[in-house]
């Protein structure tokens, strides 16, 4: 099944599962690959949610895997990589009461991706540990060169942040107020806009904001996991790292996703552990770049 179908079925019962933002991602590949989620800050990675599964091994065996039987397969199928150990036929995962969701969108526009722009990007990232303390997650994007016409470009930062406890839009704005105030004072004249929207359930948010990216594009991808210490240590070094990571991407971009936090760090998978990359447990950010084919030269 795909995530949209599972979200809909769970929502009808007042429940939610840990899943992603795309309509048509299959639950099997998502879990086997680890599966980060905006709900991870509360409940952990998708792989941490598996309770049991049925698989077909390369030799044709049909096995039930869980913490008590075929535990080696059970470990490997939770984050060990898709199509590596066999085919996932069905899976049982944890569910949770669906939370109301407050969404804050934040956008910064600049005429060019100069030093000020990258300092602003680094500053926002340096505040991720503060936001994570409120169990906030988010999908930000950085576009150093964003075409607005055939001949003109701007630099763009756009982000969607979620709070999953029913906090009002006004309260969410209050959490971000010191961040926005600092940007406005430190870099006067910054074009910054933000707004909040409240949703009664996670699925209601998903229906309105799911990923609509087209399939079939050519991209070169790269990523790093960043810990809170990296984000809050040397600001100059962080700024240079963000600039180096994103500054030569042409009309491509980067995504400093805020998807770690307490839920990922403190997750207790069935059997005590799983195959999720251990660095996820101490990271807040999945920083990825997506270089559109042919965008640099």
PLM region spans:
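Soluble FAD-dependent oxygen oxidases
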Residues: 1-297
